[in-house]
């Protein structure tokens, strides 16, 4: 069976256009730019994210003071 000439031409054109699109540097550059933007956003947001953590640690320490005071009064000041 003899294949038509236009079929070979169509296969070659589709193959080349697909490989040229796949090998294009533009999608890679966009992916790298997106990754860099995400890394910069994380670097800028990190100090802001630490403030609530320190606030929670401080509050947990302050809320434990009444329990500590009760323990000291019960065991050391008033005796067991």
UniProtKB/Swiss-Prot annotation:
The residues forming the signal peptide are 1-23
Tell me which GO cellular component terms the UniProt record holds. extracellular region
Keyword line: Amidation, Ion channel impairing toxin, Neurotoxin, Secreted, Signal, Toxin, Voltage-gated sodium channel impairing toxin
Q: What is its main location?
A: secreted
Removed propeptide positions: 24-49
Molecular-function GO terms, alphabetical = sodium channel regulator activity; toxin activity
Write out the annotated subcellular location. Secreted
- Tissue specificity: Expressed by the venom gland.
Which residue positions does Asparagine amide occur at?
78
Q: Which family does it belong to?
A: Belongs to the formicidae venom clade 1 family.
Biological function? Vertebrate selective toxin that causes pain by targeting tetrodotoxin (TTX)-sensitive sodium channels in peripheral sensory neurons. Is able to inactivate rapid activation and inactivation currents of Nav1.7/SCN9A (on mouse channel EC(50)=18 nM, on human channel EC(50)=30 nM). The leak current is via the central pore of the Nav channel. Induces a strong hyperpolarising shift in the voltage-dependence of hNav1.7/SCN9A activation, while voltage-dependence of steady-state fast inactivation is unaffected.
How is this protein named in the record?
Delta-myrmicitoxin-Ta3a
């Amino acid at each position: 069976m003899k294949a038509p000439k236009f079929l070979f031409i169509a296969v070659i054109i589709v193959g080349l256009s697909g490989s040229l699109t796949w090998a294009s540097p533009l999608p890679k550059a966009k992916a790298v730019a997106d990754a860099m933007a995400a890394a910069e956003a994380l670097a800028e947001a990190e100090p802001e994210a630490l403030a609530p953590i320190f606030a929670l640690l401080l509050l947990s320490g302050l809320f434990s003071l009444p329990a500590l005071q009760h323990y000291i009064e019960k065991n050391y000041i008033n005796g067991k």
